[in-house]
A protein has these predicted regions:
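Surface-exposed, glycine-biased beta-strand/turn segments
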Residues: 1-55
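Active-site region of chymotrypsin-like
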Residues: 14, 58-82
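A structural signal for short beta-strand/turn segments enriched in small hydrophobics and glycine
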Residues: 27, 33-35, 83-95
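Acidic, glycine-rich catalytic/binding loops that coordinate metals and/or anionic ligands
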Residues: 28, 48, 78-87, 109-147
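Loop/turn elements at helix/coil->beta-strand transitions in domains of secreted/extracellular proteins
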Residues: 32, 64-68, 88
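A residue-level detector for short acidic-glycine micro-motifs
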Residues: 37, 72-75, 94-97, 112
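Flexible, gly/ser-rich surface segments that form the specificity/activation loops bordering the active-site cleft
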Residues: 38-53, 90-106
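Histidine-centered catalytic micro-motifs
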Residues: 69-74, 102-111
Length: 147
């Protein structure tokens, strides 16, 4: 859910969602764009401040200037590299638990630049009927790699 109490309480994370999943689950692009950041060289995780900047991350730039961010990916599993174009459903990497993390999950957010500051913005999920919805705490969702 948005505005989480544990770690989603600042401008960069306020509208991020954590999606629990098994280690090694393929992560796929939610929108088309260009890969602008790939970091997948860290293997540890923990809940201390030491781990805040250690998460493995892939960021994709979209035509509207926003970025989608996929964090806590498994070390050495990035399939894409900076400069690659991706389409909806393309495999990016595998899920993990790198950096500031208490277990395997995807930390996903949509980010825009606002006054030289990156901030997370609200986004919607789309169900199997094409209906948009906002995630809620403890909501169970099953994903698909292609719409």
């Amino acid at each position: 859910a948005f505005n989480g109490q544990f770690s989603h309480n600042n401008d960069y994370n306020r509208f991020a969602v954590d999606i629990a999943m098994n280690v090694g689950t393929y992560l796929t692009a939610v929108r088309a764009g260009t890969v602008v950041w790939v970091k997948d060289d860290y293997h540890m995780s923990g809940r201390t401040n030491y781990f805040l900047d250690k998460a493995n991350v892939i960021k994709v730039l979209h035509d509207d200037g926003t970025f989608s961010s996929y964090a806590h990916i498994l070390m050495d599993t990035a399939i894409v590299k900076e400069g690659d174009s991706v389409a909806v459903g393309d495999k990016l990497a595998r899920s993990g638990s790198s950096g500031f993390s208490t277990g395997p999950h995807l930390h996903f957010s949509v980010i825009k630049n606002s006054g030289l500051k990156n901030i997370a913005i609200p986004f919607k999920f789309v169900d199997h009927t094409g209906t948009a919805f906002t995630p809620k705490r403890a909501m169970l969702m099953v994903g698909a790699s292609k719409p």
